[in-house]
Amino acid sequence: FPADLVQRIEVYKNLTPDMEGDAIGGVVNLVMRNAPPDKLFKISLTSGYNQTFVNKPYLSFGTNDIRKRSPYEIHGPNYQATGSDFTKDNLSFRNIQPLPDALGSIVWGQRFFHQKAGIIVAADYQDIKRGSTDFFIPQNNQPQENNAPGLTDFYLNRYSSTLIREGLHSRLDYDFNPGNAITLSQIYVSLKDIESRHQIDTSLTQGRTIPGTGRINISDRSREHLQNIYNATLQGNHQVNAHLSVKWRTAWSVANGLYPDWAELSSGTARIQQPDGSVATSPLLLNPLTRNWLRNRERDISTYLYLDYRLSVKDHELTLSAGGLYRNKERNNFYNDYIFQPAITTNQGQPFTDIYHAQWTNVNGPQNPLGAVANPNTYSARENINAGYFSLKLKGQKAEWIAGIRYETTNQAYISSVDPTVSYGKQGSIRYFDLLPSIQLKYQISDQQILRASGYESLSRPALYDVTFYSVQYEDYQEAGNPFLRRSHADNLDLRYELYSGGLNVIQAGVFYKRIADPYERTLLNAGDELYPIPYQGLSYTPAGVLTSQMRNAPTANACGLEISAVRYFGRLGIQAGYTYTYSNINLPDKFITREDPANPSSNLIPVTRNESRPLQGQSPHLANLGLLYADNLSGWNASLSCTYTGKRIYSASGWYGLDYWQRGYTIMDASVEKKLNKKMKVFLKVTNPLNTTIDVDLHKSNPSYGQGLIPGQRRSDLITVLRQTELPVYYVGLHWNLL
């Protein structure tokens, strides 16, 4: 959103009965502003450059001829696709020097009819280039003895992407009188994400005897992701009489996503150590090619009603509140792919040159000319939520109490195009009901001091696609849905102290406790792990088959902590600081590989269960931020420096004892400086990530091959680094111009 459209950002640490219950971590509410009393017309222009592309090129591919629909969608379900139905330009890659980033926005607003009606309109455009490098080491194989990780590959990736964002925002408001007003807000935003990835995949298990050897796959992936969202919200505030007020809101939203002709061109070779110590390289041969179309559409209709009845009881103000919510959401997902097999042109395969010289079997067409639409990724799903609440608010001179209860009913269902006689995942449904009581106290200790206490229940509802049988490989591992996923339910306690010492100076301190039943986490499964508790080919469960990421419920978790924040100004200099400590813990049975007879090293390896105690996935014990602000209104200079620290946390959980992926702590910094040239114009400079922050993810296992170079990218012997991502700074210069 352009900043001129935002009136304020509201952060709620706890919930009252009128708020939706799906908010274990609290609520952030973006309040948009109405048209101001005076005319508004502002322009902002910004340009910048990513340091990544100063020393490294941008990997580009052609997008003009990408077909937005697959042959199945264009010609119908009985059409036999041929090679001429597929462009080759999106698999022709070249290195270029990208143009600078370009960002712009324009805002106009005005009031009419004696200030009763107002309109504010904004448009924005962004063309941003991004680049990064990383490596990733998956543990796709079952762990070895004593849970030594089953590392299989070393992926070295270089990403280049262009993000083109467009947005149009409008807000109309009309004040009938001081007690009655309506507003209509509309938002349309679109994103085109054009991404290329160059990857070198070196096997750590096939032919890897010394550094520089092993089976190697080289691939270039082209992926265009198109997204757009439209939302229209109509709302009204009405003071019916001195006691009764009514608020209502209805919202209609549509979101579309499309991956058209997402493809990856790859070839394979091998570097094998010879008996004399030399290394021989085999010819580079073309690998099979898959071309994917994936699209989805979500439609959401929501209606809210809030009734407040106020009356006086002795020296207190009593407010009785009631209301409800109805939401209907529908999601339609479509997935299709075509598989091309290389033609055999030599006794070893087909030597690879480029996409224009590649030859495929089936007359250069796909092996499955009808496509592959009958899969769990082609489905329709719906979600219906009904909610109601009742609360009492009692306000005295010092204390304010709010107590009440909220109920929510949820009904989710899906049906896919899977043939039920061939596979699982045809259809399913989930229904549940929640009662969410809450109580809050706000006590005014003095004019400058406030004490707040609250207790409430909340929930976390899985996304609609997470409870289907979808299975898509977005990156170096599969992502799968989980229809057996349960919602999380939390009991929350919170105590907070606030001190307002004048001006913008604030100190806040608090403690909190949460008990979370059925928390769900992002878990990485290796090929043999259970994906679903459904019998499959003689097994009592369905195995993942490949490295797979899936949302899973964990045992009941307990989390508690403290937080403190402060804002203090010393003349022109301001300091903003905050710190949060969180302790979270779950105990769960994990698998461990050991000998059937520990005293006999030749006995069979078997899996046993060990209890493991660890934090929740994604929960860092330490979060800290520090901001330095400088403002000189006389000279027109403003500057800011902000740092955010995130402590170590579990990046991805594992069902194997001691094999969670741990992300190291990291610090991110941003800096900016602004100069006011006159009453209507400002220029600014901004730099993001000047520290060249690197993201490191480790297995907390000793590194037996450290020093031998068999696993690249390692810097320590006491752990195994499985992911390292590097992004360089981005520099921006811009202009803010108020034309009125």
What is the meaning of each model-derived region?
Residues 518, 645-653, 675-740:
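C-terminal beta-signal and adjacent terminal beta-strands/loops
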